[in-house]
Amino acid sequence: MSIPVPRPGIMELRPYTPGKSTAAGLGRVVKISANESPFGPSQKAIDAFHKAGGRMHRYPDGDATELRNAIGAVHGLDPARIVAGAGSDEILYNIARGYAGPGDEIVMSEHGFNVYPIVTHCVGATLVTAPETDLTFDVDAVLACVTERTRMVFIANPNNPTGSYIPADEMRRLRDELPGETLLVIDSAYAEYVQRNDYSVGIGLVDAADNTIMTRTFSKIYGLAALRLGWAYCPPAIADVLNRLRGPFNISTPAQRAGKCAVEDQAHVAASCDHNSVWLPWFASHMQALGLHVYPSVANFVLVRFPDAPAKNAAAAMAYYMERGVIPRETGGYGLPSCLRFTIGREDELRQAVDIARDFLAKS
C-alpha cells in the first residue's frame, strides 16, 4: 500500500531540541537551560492573563490591536508596521515562507540560532553558513557568502548561544553592502539586556530602507515564554506580506492581554536588567576563577568552555550537574560540544552552579 511522501528535504530537517527541564529521579530542579526570566512575568501581566480567562469562548482580536498599540507606544513605533506572532519563531518562519523557496539561499552565521536552519529547510531553500570570528558574527565572512540566489540573511544580535554581538556601525555596514533585494532579518530577542553604547536593536535600519526586519520576543525579559508571543517591526510592504501569511487568530486573548500589560510595566523590565547587570559578571568571574573559559556575553546567559579531558569535559560536567538537580544547556547542537550555556538565574541558583563546577573540577 502506498503512503503519502513528504516534500524533498523535509526528512533531512533536524528538529529543534529545547534545553532539558527535568532530571531523572529528582522532583525539584534548578533550570538554567532556556534563558528564561528568573523573576517570571510582571504581576500586572499575570492579573491580565487571569482576567482574560472569562472570554475564552470568544475569538481573539485578529489584529492584536491593543497589544501592537502598546508596543508602539513604549518603543515609539508605528503600530501599523508591527506584526504580532505566536512567538518570534512563527514570524521567522513566515518571513522565510514569504521570501524564499527552492533554489534560493538563506545565510546565517556558524553558531547562530538553531531555528534559522529549520525555517530554511521548511521552505525548501538552501542554508549557507558563514564562519565566525571568536564566536562572533563576521560581517565580511557573511558578505562573502552572498550570491545572486541569496534571499535573506539572519542575524541574532545578541547571538544565542554565544552571547556575542556586533556594534551598530557593523550592522549598518552589513545592510549597506548587502544587495538591496536581500532581506536582512535582525533577531533582537535579547536586546533589553544589552548595556553597550555601541549597540542598536535595529529600528533605525528598518526605518531607513524597505529591506530590513527586526524581530522581538516576550519569552525572555518579559517572562511570557509559555504564552508564545513575539513581534516584528517591518517596512509596510513586508508587514502586509506577514499579515497575509499568519493565521487569522494567531494570538490568544490571554496572550494579547498579558503581553500588553507586560510591555507597559517597564519597572519590571528595569528590575530584571538590574539583576542581570549584577549577576552576569559575578557568575562569569567566579567560573573564570575556577580556570574555565567564559565567553563575553551581553545577554542573560553565558557560554562556558570546559577542558577536553574526558573526565572534565562538557559532557561529564553536564552529567554531574544533572545528578545534582541543576540543568544548564548543552550546546553540541550548535557546533559547540565543549561548552555549556548557563542562564543568569536567581542568586541562589548561580551560587549553586558555581559550587557544583568547583566540586566537579576538584574531584579526581
Q: Where are the regions that the model predicts?
A:
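PLP-dependent aminotransferase class I/II
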Residues: 42, 211-295
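PLP-dependent aminotransferase-like
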Residues: 98-155
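Short acidic capping loops at alpha-helix termini that bridge into adjacent secondary structure
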Residues: 78-82, 102-105, 149, 181, ...
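Active-site pre-lysine segment of PLP-dependent enzymes
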Residues: 121, 139-148, 161-184, 188-221
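Phosphate-binding glycine-rich loop
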Residues: 60, 64-105, 123
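PLP-dependent enzyme catalytic core of the Aspartate aminotransferase-like
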Residues: 169, 316, 320-325, 329, ...
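N-terminal "arm"/small-domain region of PLP-dependent enzymes with the aminotransferase-like
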Residues: 1-58
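Conserved PLP-binding catalytic core of the aspartate aminotransferase-like
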Residues: 277, 288-324, 340, 344
